[in-house]
Amino acid sequence: MNNENNFSVFSGTNSRYLAEKICNSLGCPLGRMNIEHFADGEFAVSYEESIRGRDVFLVQSTFPSSDNLMELLLMIDAAKRASAHYITAVIPYFGWARQDRKDKPRVSIGAKLIADLLSKAGITRLITMDLHADQIQGFFDVPVDHLYGSTVFMEYIRKNMPLENLVVATPDVGGTKRANSYAKHLGVPMVICHKSRLKANEIAEMRIIGDVQDKDVLLVDDIVDTAGTITKAADLMKENGARSVCAIASHAVMSDPASMRVDQSTLKEMIFTDSIPYPHKCEKVKILSVADLFAEAIKRVCSHESITTLYYF
């Protein structure tokens, strides 16, 4: 793709590798930008080329720390002050998405706050993938293009996992809709893990609803953080007679001790996308790229085409 659509792609520190792959897919260079860090921990953003009147796409996942969010906000502000025409935030992993509602008294709703900050900074569109809660799209007053990791996962599953003995499973009731979509499109049964938590990242009890005896189980989730839920679900599947257990999840948050838990679990394979950089070496982890998916979304936004056909479900 040539650059006749008058657009430029830039990247924050956290997502540079993915942004480079997106640009390779688009056939355009990654835009030149400088992020200067100071001794006191502050940083400043400046564009090293003119973006006046251009449509800019700023690629940055807001994980693993608030610095990445602040960096993105400064990128947006600098683009607005440099007279960019349209400013699209491309956020492969939208951090704080698990703070999407008031589930107890006197608690913040982080996802809404982040949406307000991005909008106030000056974005005119958001492209993201597999939000933890679909309703977060409604927190924005600008268009939101919500992509799905299933677009790349389904191709991998069909090529590498025999469907005749496959069962799709969700590690918690909240993921039932997602797992049901996979089961429906693959034409296979679904089972559910029901869990109760003592507190965040700490599971009290888990049980299976459904039959996995002598089946190859595919656990489906959106985020793996400490990997406590996904590995406990895998172990439970094996205890209940599953022949093998693999898992897919869009976002590899993988906070310690997640990698160790995955390696020591009964999981045969753990498959993520590259929405978040995953630098650790874990023999069971496989990474699928979503660069082509985001590149196609950017291309269609620039040419005012529908992106609905990019959705697998």
From Swiss-Prot:
<dbReference type="GO" id="GO:0016301">
    <property type="term" value="F:kinase activity"/>
</dbReference>
<dbReference type="Pfam" id="PF14572">
    <property type="entry name" value="Pribosyl_synth"/>
</dbReference>
<keyword id="KW-0545">Nucleotide biosynthesis</keyword>
<comment type="function">
    <text>Involved in the biosynthesis of the central metabolite phospho-alpha-D-ribosyl-1-pyrophosphate (PRPP) via the transfer of pyrophosphoryl group from ATP to 1-hydroxyl of ribose-5-phosphate (Rib-5-P).</text>
</comment>
<dbReference type="InterPro" id="IPR000842">
    <property type="entry name" value="PRib_PP_synth_CS"/>
</dbReference>
<dbReference type="InterPro" id="IPR037515">
    <property type="entry name" value="Rib-P_diPkinase_bac"/>
</dbReference>
<keyword id="KW-0547">Nucleotide-binding</keyword>
<dbReference type="InterPro" id="IPR000836">
    <property type="entry name" value="PRibTrfase_dom"/>
</dbReference>
<keyword id="KW-0963">Cytoplasm</keyword>
<feature type="binding site">
    <location>
        <begin position="225"/>
        <end position="229"/>
    </location>
    <ligand>
        <name>D-ribose 5-phosphate</name>
    </ligand>
</feature>
<feature type="binding site">
    <location>
        <begin position="40"/>
        <end position="42"/>
    </location>
    <ligand>
        <name>ATP</name>
    </ligand>
</feature>
<dbReference type="InterPro" id="IPR029099">
    <property type="entry name" value="Pribosyltran_N"/>
</dbReference>
<keyword id="KW-0067">ATP-binding</keyword>
<feature type="binding site">
    <location>
        <position position="172"/>
    </location>
    <ligand>
        <name>Mg(2+) 2</name>
    </ligand>
</feature>
<dbReference type="GO" id="GO:0004749">
    <property type="term" value="F:ribose phosphate diphosphokinase activity"/>
</dbReference>
<dbReference type="InterPro" id="IPR029057">
    <property type="entry name" value="PRTase-like"/>
</dbReference>
<feature type="binding site">
    <location>
        <position position="197"/>
    </location>
    <ligand>
        <name>D-ribose 5-phosphate</name>
    </ligand>
</feature>
<keyword id="KW-0479">Metal-binding</keyword>
<dbReference type="GO" id="GO:0000287">
    <property type="term" value="F:magnesium ion binding"/>
</dbReference>
<protein>
    <recommendedName>
        <fullName>Ribose-phosphate pyrophosphokinase</fullName>
        <ecNumber>2.7.6.1</ecNumber>
    </recommendedName>
</protein>
<dbReference type="GO" id="GO:0005524">
    <property type="term" value="F:ATP binding"/>
</dbReference>
<comment type="pathway">
    <text>Metabolic intermediate biosynthesis; 5-phospho-alpha-D-ribose 1-diphosphate biosynthesis; 5-phospho-alpha-D-ribose 1-diphosphate from D-ribose 5-phosphate (route I): step 1/1.</text>
</comment>
<feature type="binding site">
    <location>
        <begin position="98"/>
        <end position="99"/>
    </location>
    <ligand>
        <name>ATP</name>
    </ligand>
</feature>
<dbReference type="GO" id="GO:0006164">
    <property type="term" value="P:purine nucleotide biosynthetic process"/>
</dbReference>
<keyword id="KW-0460">Magnesium</keyword>
<feature type="binding site">
    <location>
        <position position="132"/>
    </location>
    <ligand>
        <name>Mg(2+) 1</name>
    </ligand>
</feature>
<dbReference type="GO" id="GO:0009156">
    <property type="term" value="P:ribonucleoside monophosphate biosynthetic process"/>
</dbReference>
<dbReference type="GO" id="GO:0006015">
    <property type="term" value="P:5-phosphoribose 1-diphosphate biosynthetic process"/>
</dbReference>
<dbReference type="Pfam" id="PF13793">
    <property type="entry name" value="Pribosyltran_N"/>
</dbReference>
<keyword id="KW-0808">Transferase</keyword>
<dbReference type="GO" id="GO:0002189">
    <property type="term" value="C:ribose phosphate diphosphokinase complex"/>
</dbReference>
<keyword id="KW-0418">Kinase</keyword>
<dbReference type="InterPro" id="IPR005946">
    <property type="entry name" value="Rib-P_diPkinase"/>
</dbReference>
<dbReference type="GO" id="GO:0005737">
    <property type="term" value="C:cytoplasm"/>
</dbReference>
<comment type="similarity">
    <text>Belongs to the ribose-phosphate pyrophosphokinase family. Class I subfamily.</text>
</comment>
<comment type="subunit">
    <text>Homohexamer.</text>
</comment>
<feature type="active site">
    <location>
        <position position="195"/>
    </location>
</feature>
<feature type="binding site">
    <location>
        <position position="221"/>
    </location>
    <ligand>
        <name>D-ribose 5-phosphate</name>
    </ligand>
</feature>
